[in-house]
Amino acid sequence: MGSIKDWNGRDPREAQDIKKRWQEYTEELYKKDLHDPDNHNGVITHLEPDILEWEVKWVLESMTKNKANGGDGIPVELFQILKDDAVKVLHSICQQIWKAQQWSQDWKRSVFIPIPKKGNAKECSNYHTIALISHASKVMLKILQARLQQYVNRELSDVQAGFRKGRGTRDQIANIHWIIDKARESQKSIYFCFIDYAKAFDCVNHN
């Protein structure tokens, strides 16, 4: 475990102190501090159908092998070897969560892995914090993601290319090239504004 600075700029030496510093940093990073009120206008209120066995089976078959395990230490390969037995057990758990509308406490646990970025390696902010969650919880998450995707795609603007299936930043780069070429042809000035939000993913309100 590498040495990092604490809040006071000191270098903690003991592993326990370093662990505590990372805990403080991640808790602060994911603490909700949004001033805009939640806007629930237009929220879809009709109920989705129960979790179906074929959804669980579809997710397990599509999950990539040789991925890092979450806190429970269970590899995805085990579920795939057990096949229908794993499908039945996971389907029962997912259905219980769906009915109770309460996420499993075990599935809430994750292992944070700090991946260094450019800059001072002693600053926690110069690390990507990757969370390893259990493969069992990924099954439920992927089912929810697939169900939500059909609604999200209808709501997103056509000009958005990032974080959409089959599209990406390359589409926007192509658009920028096209705009520049047209501006040159007509000898007009153009201005681009690029905004990079710090910790954009970490600041999303997930409530």
What are these regions (language model features)?
Residues S3, M63-I74, K122-L132, R170-N207:
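Conserved catalytic palm subdomain of right-hand nucleotidyl-transferase polymerases, strongest
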Residues L144:
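Extended, charged alpha/beta regions that create polyanion-binding interfaces
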Residues M1-N126, A131, H135-V139:
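Surface-exposed loop/turn segments and immediately adjacent short secondary-structure elements
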Residues L34-W58, Q102, W107-V111, Q150-C203:
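Active-site-proximal segment of RNA-dependent polymerases
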